[in-house]
Design a protein with these regions (language model features):
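Conserved AAA+ ATPase small/helical "lid" subdomain
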Residues: 1-13
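C-terminal alpha-helical interaction modules of replication/initiation AAA+ assemblies
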Residues: 10-21, 25-27, 34-176
Length: 176
């Protein structure tokens, strides 16, 4: 606790009275981000442009961190989330309401996960999820084949296509 509280001394001048909002602001900036927190940001009850902005902010934090900042790790985490969403949609297909035992046996034991995937299922249809999984595979292949030169741009475009276009690829303008 002493170690954690000592961070506040570096953030504020001597004699400053730290408020709850100050603590929240410091802790939110020190929170460790991952593909899973990015998935949560994609689900927020905000307009798509704001969800994209928040997801891009998390992407920047991940890329600047020393731990798990590889695009392959980021994409793998998102693939895991969208595969679980696909499983959730399959369990709930055709109006079927699964029991708690059925949900737990499929990996949705916590109420938080159940709320998260119920919210995601309202945002993306099974068709969208299939398109997003294909997009994630395409982006992974492109990043592995082109190297690190354009990886940030490719990840940014991928997030745009997931959040604003529901997995549809951006059209390319071609001239003769």
């Amino acid at each position: 606790l002493r170690n954690e509280c000592s961070r506040f001394f570096m953030c504020f001048p001597a004699g400053y009275k730290v408020t709850n909002s100050d603590v929240e602001q410091i802790l939110s900036h020190n929170r460790e981000e991952s593909a899973f927190t990015m998935f949560d940001a994609m689900l927020e009850s905000l307009p798509p442009a704001k969800r994209l902005e928040n997801s891009l902010s998390i992407l920047q934090k991940i890329l600047l961190s020393k731990k798990d900042n590889s695009p392959v790790v980021i994409i793998a985490g998102l693939v895991s989330c969208f595969r679980r969403l696909s499983m959730w949609q399959t369990i709930h297909s055709q109006g079927h309401i699964p029991s708690d035992i059925e949900l737990k046996s499929n990996g949705f034991s916590s109420k938080t996960a159940q709320r998260q995937y119920a919210k995601a299922a309202k945002l993306w249809t099974p068709g969208h999820v299939a398109a997003i999984l294909a997009l994630l595979a395409k982006t992974d292949l492109e990043i592995r084949s082109t190297g690190s030169l354009f990886q940030e741009n490719q990840l940014t475009l991928m997030l745009y296509e997931i959040i604003l276009k529901n997995g549809a690829y951006c059209a390319r303008y071609e001239t003769d």
